[in-house]
Amino acid sequence: MAAKEVKFGRSAREKMLRGVDILADAVKVTLGPKGRNVVIDKSFGAPRITKDGVTVAKEIELEDKFENMGAQMVREVASKTNDIAGDGTTTATVLAQAIVREGAKAVAAGMNPMDLKRGIDLAVAEVVKDLLAKAKKINTSDEVAQVGTISANGEKQIGLDIAEAMQKVGNEGVITVEEAKTAETELEVVEGMQFDRGYLSPYFVTNPEKMVADLEDAFILLHEKKLSNLQAMLPVLEAVVQTGKPLLIIAEDVEGEALATLVVNKLRGGLKIAAVKAPGFGDRRKAMLEDIAILTGGTVISEDLGIKLESVTLDMLGRAKKVSITKENTTIVDGAGQKSDIEGRVAQIKAQIEETTSDYDREKLQERLAKLAGGVAVIRVGGATEVEVKEKKDRIDDALNATRAAVQEGIVPGGGVALLRSSVKITVKGENDDQDAGVNIVRRALQSPARQIVENAGDEASIVVGKILEKNTDDFGYNAQTGEYGDMIAMGIIDPVKVVRTALQDAASVASLLITTEAMIAELPKKDAPAMPGGMGGMGGMDMM
C-alpha cells in the first residue's frame, strides 16, 4: 500500500477551497446570455469551444491531490444536476462555490460545522417550497419555444425547433440531437414506433423507386424464436389470406425454407407480406416485442407463455393502420392497442427508469418509453465547421433538457431573479446561533447566480441586484442581454423550476459535505526511480555507434 499524506482542519479546508475556486471560476464565466466561451485543448483534433458548464467541469483535473478533491466534489454537483435536470450546471457550481466560501469563513470563525449544515438544510427546504409555490405551468408552444431559446443562449431558431419537435412527438417523445452533413439545422419527425431493423429480403419491397415496403391496415405476428419452416404457421397464414390484409412477421430471424416460401408467395401475388428481425438483444428483445404487442393489441408468441405457432388465431395478431419498412428501419404507425394498456406500460417503464442506476439502461428505457408514447424527432445540427457544430449541439442538448424540465414542473423568472427573491423571503429560524448562520449563508449564496450573470455582461452587480430587490414584484428583473429592467416573464427570460431547484439542492448537499470535512487523505506522489548512470564499467575505449 502506497504511503498517504493526511491534512487536518484549516490547512485541509484551504487546499480544498482553492480547488473549488479554480473549477468554479472556470465554469462561471459561461453563465448568462453574455457568458464567455471556454476553449478546451484536446490531445487530438481541434480545440473544443463550449459554453456548457458541465463540459468545462469534466475537463478539469488538478495536479495537487488535495485541491483536486475539492474540484472533483464540485464537478460532482455539475454532473448530478446535469443528470437530473439536464441544465443549470453553471448555476449549481456558482451556488456551491458561494456556500463553501461563506461556510469556510464561518467554520474558521469557530462555528460548529454540523449546526451550519443543519441551518443550510433548513433554508434550502424553505426556498424549494417557495420556488414550487410560485411556479407557472407552461401550456403553449410559444412558452416552450421561449424556454428553449433562453437555454440555447438566445438563439431563437433552436427554441422554435424544440417547440415544434415537442408538439409533434409529445412531451414524453424521444428527441435526439445529431450532427448534420449540411450547414443547415433541420428537424425530422418520425411518428409511431420505429426500430432499427429492416426487411429480411428486398423482394418484400412494394415501392421499388424508394425501396420501401408499405403495408396498409396490416396484421402483425410477433414471434420470439427463429422461424425456419412454415409448416406450423400455415393455419394462421391461411386465415390472414382470407381477410385480404397484409401481414408483417417480426421474429428473432426468418431463415432458409421459411423465408424462401414467403418470398415465393409474395412474388406470385397470393400474399402481401414482409418479415423483419425483432429489435434488441436478449431480455431487451423480449421487452421490446412486448412493447410492440401492447402498441398493436397483439400477443407475443412465446413458449414461455405456452403458446405454440400452430394454435395462433387472428385475434392474437397485432394490427396497425400503416407499417413502413426500409432497408434499415421499420416504422409502425397507429397501432390498434388499448389506450389503457399503453398507459400502464408507460407507467411501468417510468418506474424502471426511476430505479435503474445504469446510464445505459436508463437511456434505452427512455427510448422505449418514447416509442410507446408518441414518436421520435431528430434535430440535425448543421454548421460551417466541426467546432461550430459541436458547440451548437451542446447548446441544443441543454435547451432540450431545460424545456423538458419546464414542462414537468413549470417555470419561474430567469436571470437568477427567482433565487434572488427567495433570499429575501427566508424566514426560518434555527435552534441556535450557528444554525441561523447556516441560514444566512444560503441567504447570501442565493444572490450569487444573479450577480455572476450581471458581471459576465460587464455591469455592476451590486447596483443591479439592489435595484431588483427595491421593486417588490416577483417577475421584475434585469435583462443582461439588452441592459433593460422589466417583467422577466414578459421579456421571455425564464428558468424551469426543476433546473433551479435541482441546482440549489445539489449545490447545498455537496457544499455541506465540504464544510463539515475535518481531514483529507491523499496518496503521496510517487518518487521516480533514479535514471540509469551514464557509461558502464569495462567498456572503455568502445566507440558508440
Swiss-Prot record:
SUPFAM superfamilies hit by this protein: GroEL apical domain-like (SSF52029), GroEL equatorial domain-like (SSF48592), GroEL-intermediate domain like (SSF54849)
Record's keyword annotation contains Cytoplasm: yes
GO biological process: protein refolding
Cellular compartments per GO CC: cytoplasm
Binding of ATP, residues: 30-33, 51, 87-91, 415, 495
GO molecular function: ATP binding; ATP-dependent protein folding chaperone; isomerase activity; unfolded protein binding
Annotated family: Belongs to the chaperonin (HSP60) family.
NCBIfam families the UniProt entry points to: GroEL (TIGR02348), PRK00013.1 (NF000592), PRK12849.1 (NF009487), PRK12850.1 (NF009488), PRK12851.1 (NF009489)
Binding partners and assembly: Forms a cylinder of 14 subunits composed of two heptameric rings stacked back-to-back. Interacts with the co-chaperonin GroES.
Stated name of the protein: Chaperonin GroEL 4
